[in-house]
């Protein structure tokens, strides 16, 4: 896809990831300014905040299909077996680890997270505690010492038997958590995932396992840490010969009843007010996804920086995986891991 943008051979209408705007069109050269077709594409159905997130180089280069964020999901059946309610706070979660180990066994954990999940939860924790965004104006807002605090928090979850080690997850032999037998049978009783992922994880559970939406924790600090992001966008190629027709198609899919019914919530809870109303009026929303999405968007204070998801950081050979795996294996202490993380992030931001 990146080659098609570079060579001008991309389709007229594109479904893109949000960070593609900054990756492929930081100067506005790849995507058409949708403000030019606002007489056809009804932009009033989208919040100013959401449109601003897609505005780069003073051009509205895409329109958001949906917004998403991270939240906890729990296997209530396993918590019931442990004699516990599902966690409403960080304190509840920390207390659950030893209870799971004592009452259910060493293989049971209240929560399971891979390296990228851990990075996001660490950022939630730090933003809650320190009250500032992770990155702002293309600059990392946290010192190595503050990040070390966040890494120690992640280590404390392992130490308290709240989450399994990376080695344990690797030994499970599953390519992803939803395909892990320990998630399927309830031995891993929680995940920290995008609100739109509910169906995938619920569908993977064995029969009889009850899956519920959790809460955003408010006892990590005085601020509401965490972030929402545009989960997916529609964009028009800059070199299109048919901008009006492209705008009409996007408006049909996002704002008009017939098109909205086709899309439903397959790509998340609609960011368009008109689209959301159509889905609500026609019972087209997955109830758990809708519940999770409303909780996330009501809680978070911060926007995700688009470079947070840069390949050099989030891919399995990237900085996040190196840092979190190294910390879990004991290859790095928190100070070393913080230095590596800062260096890797600043390298991406400075490109």
Regions found by a protein language model. Name each.
Residues 1-46, 77-88, 181-190, 204, ...:
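Extracytoplasmic "Venus flytrap"/periplasmic binding protein-like
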Residues 3-4, 11-12, 41-78, 109-110, ...:
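A structural signal for short loop-to-beta-strand junctions that line the ligand-binding cleft
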Residues 9, 83-85, 137, 158-173, ...:
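A local structural motif
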Residues 17-70, 146, 212-215, 288, ...:
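Hinge/lid segment of periplasmic solute-binding proteins
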Residues 18-19, 90-94, 167-184:
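Short helix-initiation/N-cap motifs at beta->coil->alpha
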Residues 30-33, 196-199, 216, 232-314, ...:
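Mature extracytoplasmic/periplasmic domains
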Residues 97-98, 139-171:
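Glycine-centered hinge/linker elements that transmit conformational signals in sensory
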Residues 228, 290-349:
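C-terminal capping/gating helix-and-loop segments adjacent to ligand/active sites or protein-protein/ligand interfaces
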């Amino acid at each position: 896809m990146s080659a098609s943008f570079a060579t001008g051979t991309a389709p007229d209408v594109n479904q893109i990831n949000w960070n593609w705007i900054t990756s492929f069109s930081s100067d506005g050269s790849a995507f058409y300014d949708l403000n030019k077709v606002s007489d056809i594409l009804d932009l009033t159905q989208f919040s100013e905040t959401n449109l601003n997130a897609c505005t780069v180089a003073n051009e509205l280069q895409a329109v958001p299909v949906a917004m998403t964020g991270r939240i906890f999901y729990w296997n209530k059946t396993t918590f019931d077996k442990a004699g516990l309610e599902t966690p409403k706070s960080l304190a509840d979660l920390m207390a659950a680890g030893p209870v799971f180990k004592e009452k259910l066994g060493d293989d049971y954990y209240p929560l399971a997270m891979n390296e990228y999940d851990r990075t996001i939860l660490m950022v939630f924790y730090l933003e809650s505690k320190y009250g500032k965004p992770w990155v702002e104006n293309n600059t990392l807002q946290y010192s190595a010492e503050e990040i070390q605090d966040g890494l120690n928090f992640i280590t404390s979850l392992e130490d308290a038997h709240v989450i399994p080690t990376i080695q344990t997850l690797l030994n499970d032999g599953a390519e992803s958590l939803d395909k892990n037998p320990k998630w399927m049978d309830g031995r891993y009783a929680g995940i920290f995932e995008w609100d739109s992922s509910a169906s995938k994880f619920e569908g993977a559970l064995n029969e009889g396992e009850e899956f519920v939406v959790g809460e955003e924790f408010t006892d990590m600090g005085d601020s509401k840490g965490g972030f929402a992001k545009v989960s997916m966008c529609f964009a028009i190629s800059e070199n299109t010969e048919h901008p009006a027709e492209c705008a009409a198609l996007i408006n049909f899919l996002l704002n008009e009843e017939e098109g909205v019914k086709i899309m439903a919530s397959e790509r998340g809870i609609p960011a368009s007010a008109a689209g959301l109303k159509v889905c609500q009026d026609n019972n087209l929303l997955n109830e758990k996804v809708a519940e999770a999405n409303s909780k996330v968007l009501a809680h978070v204070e911060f926007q995700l920086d688009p470079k947070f998801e840069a390949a050099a950081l989030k891919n399995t050979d990237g900085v996040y995986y190196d840092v979190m795996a190294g910390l879990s294996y004991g290859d790095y202490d928190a100070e070393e891991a913080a230095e590596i993380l800062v260096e890797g992030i600043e390298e991406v931001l400075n490109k």
